[in-house]
């Protein structure tokens, strides 16, 4: 069995910098993807148009065959004037990180009201606001990594109400509450879902650092909500599979954003009392086969093209032109299993361990045409 997908697009990926970037940037294409939406949390973060364009140029030098969509890091230095400049230069979005919540987020935000002039400028220029949907842990308020995402959702709803024409993406949702919140919003609010959050629950990362990411995977019921919103429309009202008719339309505001986040393996596998392991799961090298594998596992393979291409491209206004739609990536089912590589070597002498290293999946890429 083979499946061909037109121009898969990953709407949330970390391609890092230096020798690590040299390793992981080609993995976007290796994993089956032709468009990548690039996160700006470098050291220092990407806060100006010039920095974003320079970063894009560095990625293009590594692999010119991918379309890179660039973003800015929301910070106090950002101005409405810079937003107008960025939009004119083709920068697509601005990423918001709550302070200290995830990798390289020390310069993140503490109050959204401060940035309302920025959001107004973004709305005027039809840019996208990408939200890391968690609030920092606070023992006095009983906020922790499990409820950080649900606790953030009132901010999402408030922003949507204040800026109804601003396109907003709640990134890497992990909870049923997040799914329901996005569903309750209008057509300008969307949500990315990662491949690994379709696999994992809390039991999979507690004690296993290579599955640890931010936001953390939650409970089985939350995972079911993520899976269900992707599968939506495949089953009729009586629970029977539509075999002889085309599936009903799925939910167009939920699509893939891998949040593929590589870290040298020693930062994932070791920690000290004053330094925890790095948060991030690396899926880029096998992303499309991995998504096919997990969707097939719960009867949602028919949603693959919508999830990895159609829905995200439509929301980001990157629909395929007629001539582009011919560029397809073909997956082949491998009943005996296709083993995921154990690790990838960085030129610095370190290595990166991918998600599900050494395990078998049922799909592999056979060609691109």
What spans do the regions from the language model cover?
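His/Asp/Glu-enriched, well-ordered alpha-helical/loop segment
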Residues: 255-315, 319-320
């Amino acid at each position: 069995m083979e499946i061909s997908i037109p121009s898969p697009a990953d709407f949330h990926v970390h391609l890092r910098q230096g020798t690590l970037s040299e390793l992981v940037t080609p993995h976007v294409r290796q994993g089956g993807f032709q468009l990548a939406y690039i996160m700006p949390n470098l050291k220092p973060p990407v806060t100006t148009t010039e920095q974003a364009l320079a970063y894009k140029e560095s990625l293009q030098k590594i692999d010119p065959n991918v379309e890179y969509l660039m973003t800015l890091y929301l910070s106090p230095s950002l101005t409405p004037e810079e937003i107008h400049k960025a939009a004119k230069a083709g920068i697509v979005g601005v990423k918001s990180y709550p302070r200290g919540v995830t990798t390289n987020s020390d310069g993140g935000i503490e109050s959204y009201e401060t940035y309302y002039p920025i959001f107004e400028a973004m709305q005027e220029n039809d840019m996208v606001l990408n939200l890391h949907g968690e609030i920092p842990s606070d023992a006095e308020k009983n906020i922790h990594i499990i409820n950080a995402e649900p606790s953030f959702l009132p901010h999402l709803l408030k922003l949507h109400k204040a800026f109804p024409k601003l396109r907003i993406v709640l990134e890497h949702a992990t909870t049923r509450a997040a799914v329901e919140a996005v569903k309750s919003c209008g057509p300008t609010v969307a949500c990315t879902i990662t491949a690994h959050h379709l696999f994992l629950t809390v039991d999979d990362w507690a004690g296993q650092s290579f599955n640890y990411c931010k936001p953390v995977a939650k409970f089985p019921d939350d995972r079911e909500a993520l899976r269900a919103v992707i599968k939506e429309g495949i089953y009729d009202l009586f629970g029977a599979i539509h075999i002889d008719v085309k599936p009903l339309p799925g939910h167009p505001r939920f699509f893939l954003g891998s949040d593929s986040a590589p870290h040298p393996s020693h930062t994932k596998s070791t920690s000290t009392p004053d330094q925890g392991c790095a948060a991030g799961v690396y899926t880029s090298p096998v992303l499309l086969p991995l998504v096919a594998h997990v969707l097939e596992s719960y009867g949602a393979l028919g949603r693959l093209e919508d999830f990895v291409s159609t829905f995200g491209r439509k929301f980001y206004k990157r629909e395929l032109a007629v001539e582009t739609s011919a560029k397809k990536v073909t997956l082949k089912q491998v009943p005996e299993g296709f083993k995921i590589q154990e690790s990838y070597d960085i030129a610095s002498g370190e290595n990166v361990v991918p998600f599900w290293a050494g395990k078998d999946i049922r799909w592999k890429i056979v060609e691109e045409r």
